Every structure is written in C-alpha cells, then in structure tokens.
C-alpha cells in the first residue's frame, strides 16, 4: 500500500462507508422486509404443522425415508434442518434478527424523515405555488380572519405570518407507521427472549404428591427452571358424562414454599391454567397412578399402576396385588378409567370378578377391598418470559395501525391584494377532504361571488 492509498481522498478510504451505505439501503428496502416476513411466516407454519419436540421414534414412524413426504421430507431431513424445534433454531432466530434490523433501518431511513418532513413546512407566498396542490382555488374576496374560525372548527392547528397561513391536522397518521415498526420490533425481541429464556416440561403426578419442575424437555440457553417453591397436587378428579365419556378433568394445585406455607392455590382444567412466578401449569392429560387396597383387616396400602398397551389403542391400566406375605402369589387388577370399578384376575389369568371402590371381593381365603383408584394429573409446564413483551408489541402494532388510518391534511392560504388563494392536500380520504375544503370555501364566499366553489376548485390531476 502506498502513501496515497491511505490518504483521506483515496477510494480505499471511503470503501467501507460505501459498503455500509449500500448494505443499509438494501436491508431497509421494503421488498427485503416483505421477503423476510414471508420466510418467517412459512417456517412458522411448518413449526405449527410439524410436531415440535417429539422423540426420534415419533419422527421415524411419521416421516419415513420411503416414501418421503413430498418426495424429500424424511425424518433425517427434518431433524437435520431442525424442523423438530423450528422456533429455537439458529437460522430462524437469524431471520427474526434480520427482520428486526430491516425494520429499524426502514424506520430511520424512511419513516422518521417522513415525520420530520411533515413537521417542517413553509408558508406559500406566491400564487403559483398553489398550482401544484391537488386542490386549490382563487377567490376575489376573503380574509385569513374569516378562514381561521372555519379551520379551528375542523380541528386544524393554525400557523400565521402576516397574510400567509398554514394549517394541518392528523399528524398522528404520520406517527402511526413508526409505532407499527416499534411494535413489530418489540414483538421480535419478545420472541427471541422467550426462545432463549423459556422452557417446557411435562409431569405426570399422582394425587397427594408434592413435586418440583424437573422433567424439562425443551429449554433455552438462558432458562432457569429451578424455583424456591414446589407444587402440591391436592386432588385430581374427572367428571364424566351420563354416557361414560370424559367431560372435563381437574387438578387442585397448591404452590408452597420450603416451609410448606401455601403461596397460591387454584383448581385447573383444560384451558384454565395456573400461572405463578412466570410459569404456567396447563392441564393436558391424565393417568391412573395407583390403587389403594386392603386385605382382610390389614392397613390400607397403595400400589403403583402402569398403563398396558392394547391393540385398539384403548386406555387400560394394571396393578399387581400380593395376597401372601412372602409375595409368592397375587392377583392382577385392571382399570379403564377413574369411575370407580376394576376387574380382578388370578395368576392363571382367570376372571375372579369385578369390584367397585368401597366394595370387597373374595380371592380364595382373602377378602380384598378396593379402597380407591389414585388418579395422576398430566401437566404441561411452560415458562416464556417473552410473552408480556410480545403482547406489548401486539398492542403497539394495533395502536399504530389505527393511527395510520388518520388522514394527514394540510391547508395553505394567501391574501394578496384583492385576491385570496386557498388550497390543500391530504394523504388519504381524498373525497372527504375535498368536501371539507368545499364547505370552507362555501362559507367564505358571499352572495356577490362571481363564481361558485364548484367551478373555481381545480385539481392538478385534470
């Protein structure tokens, strides 16, 4: 490199600045923003259609290599691209970041300059300046003093300098697009924050058991699931319809501190979760966790139950109850639901009989009492610190959209000798603005006018 190459006037010296300006201009292009938004939408739809966070076996069964879905989407491709966790993949987050940068660049390059232009205005001091307005008229009489009350009635903000007048209203319509951009950026920040700081967990907890959130299957790199409190499942139950179908299932949950003091309590059901300390507990499923039985006059004891796979996919749970002290013999108890009935089989697989909760059944010389069926609540536990931020962003977007529909209207007037010039323009609702201006002109004209507003109002489009 020579001395001349390092001088301020060297082309190499200005090269980084040119690259920066070119890149900024490109990223601020509306077409680029739309393309990024479309890509984000497509991958978001894929994340909705394709089950997220399932096991490899699930994807192998539902997305086989032969035949592959759409000819190419096999489980290997799906996992390789990260389509099993779309919203936390590096490329999805890069798209969100790029879209946010595009919005910021567009805001500073287009929207803020447009607002600045709207706030900077000039008086019209020459008649020919009115010719460039979409709507203008020339009257042989009129005054600014008679015009000002009419504009004030229409809620215009008025500025006057001698015989020159400028009025405007609806500048909030210029601020609206900026608010929309800010709202979208806030929404993106909330989404990224939720992806990095949130987690999801699943728990299957029997009634009467205390638990902490441990079974986390999806977590952001900055997430923290450990909390100084735990949750008691006070009770789980199911309401059934008269036909035996499930109507709704409920969990009575209590949040307790390390000393057992209750901090929060709520009975949750499907679509009615418990929210506490940034974590939401959703009621999603259920199971039979165990059975409580009594043999003759023995103490009541609880045995675990396990789900048994069936050919038709029907739900079935079973438990084994020893009937001898050395556990050398026992019976099997099968249950389909929590309606209080069970079927008992001996070791040979022969039916002993059916029994309901609270009833006894003789098994040889043993009297077996079915005390209770213990239900387990299936909870989906989710923490997303970005949710309040996302909601705030949505509110800002909606507010900005409403503001954007406000028309930004401008009116100029000039009293020059015995001539009076009046004109204006608006960025939307052209017909309504024309009627408004005609109404003002009609008020200004006297009965001795030589022409009517209809034939004096002109449009540069004609």
UniProtKB/Swiss-Prot annotation:
The keyword Cytoplasm does not apply. It comes from the Bacteria. It is found in: Cellular thylakoid membrane. Disulfide bonds: none annotated. Signal peptide: none annotated. The chain crosses the membrane at residues 30-50, 89-109, 175-195. InterPro entries: Cyt_c_bgen_Ccs1/CcsB/ResB, ResB-like_domain. Keywords: Cytochrome c-type biogenesis, Membrane, Thylakoid, Transmembrane, Transmembrane helix. It is a multi-pass membrane protein. GO terms for cellular component: plasma membrane-derived thylakoid membrane. GO terms for biological process: cytochrome complex assembly. Required during biogenesis of c-type cytochromes (cytochrome c6 and cytochrome f) at the step of heme attachment. Belongs to the Ccs1/CcsB family. May interact with CcsA. This is Cytochrome c biogenesis protein CcsB.
């Amino acid at each position: 490199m020579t001395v001349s190459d390092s001088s301020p006037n060297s082309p190499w010296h200005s090269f980084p600045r040119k690259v920066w300006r070119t890149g900024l201009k490109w990223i601020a292009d509306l077409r680029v923003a739309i393309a990024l938004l479309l890509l984000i939408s497509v991958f978001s739809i894929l994340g909705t259609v394709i089950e997220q966070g399932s096991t490899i076996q699930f994807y192998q069964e539902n997305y086989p290599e032969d035949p592959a879905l759409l000819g190419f989407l096999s489980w290997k491709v799906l996992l390789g691209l990260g389509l099993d966790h779309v919203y936390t993949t590096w490329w999805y987050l890069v798209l969100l970041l790029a879209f946010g940068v595009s919005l910021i660049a567009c805001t500073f390059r287009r929207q803020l300059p447009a607002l600045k232009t709207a706030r900077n205005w000039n008086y019209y001091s020459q008649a020919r300046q009115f010719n460039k307005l979409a709507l203008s008229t020339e009257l042989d009489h009129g005054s600014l003093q008679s015009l000002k009350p009419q504009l004030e009635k229409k809620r215009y903000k008025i500025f006057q300098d001698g015989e020159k007048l400028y009025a405007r209203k609806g500048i909030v319509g210029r601020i609206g697009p900026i608010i929309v951009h800010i709202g979208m950026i806030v929404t993106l920040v909330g989404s990224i924050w939720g992806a990095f700081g949130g987690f999801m967990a699943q728990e299957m907890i029997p009634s009467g058991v205390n638990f902490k959130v441990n079974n986390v299957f999806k977590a952001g790199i900055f997430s923290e699931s450990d909390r100084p409190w735990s949750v008691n499942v006070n009770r789980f139950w199911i309401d059934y319809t008269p036909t035996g179908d499930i109507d709704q299932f409920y969990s009575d949950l209590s949040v307790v501190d390390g000393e057992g003091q209750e901090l929060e309590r709520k009975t949750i059901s499907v679509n009615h979760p418990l929210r506490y300390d940034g974590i939401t507990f959703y009621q999603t499923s259920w199971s039979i966790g165990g059975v409580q039985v009594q043999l003759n006059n023995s103490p009541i004891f609880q045995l675990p139950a396990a789900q048994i796979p069936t050919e038709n996919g029907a739900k079935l749970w079973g438990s084994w109850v020893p009937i001898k002290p050395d556990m050398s013999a026992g019976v099997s108890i099968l249950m389909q639901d929590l309606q209080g009935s069970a079927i008992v089989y001996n070791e040979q697989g022969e039916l002993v009989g059916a029994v309901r909760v609270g009833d006894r059944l003789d098994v040889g010389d043993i009297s077996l009492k079915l005390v209770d069926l213990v239900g387990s609540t299936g909870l989906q536990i989710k923490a997303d610190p970005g949710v309040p931020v996302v909601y705030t962003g949505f509110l800002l977007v909606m507010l900005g959209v409403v503001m954007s529909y406000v028309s930004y209207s401008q009116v100029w007037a000039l009293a020059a000798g015995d001539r009076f010039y009046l004109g204006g323009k608006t960025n939307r609702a052209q017909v309504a603005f024309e009627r408004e201006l005609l109404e003002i002109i009609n008020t200004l004209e006297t009965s001795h006018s030589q022409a009517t507003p209809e034939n004096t109002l002109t449009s540069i489009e004609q």
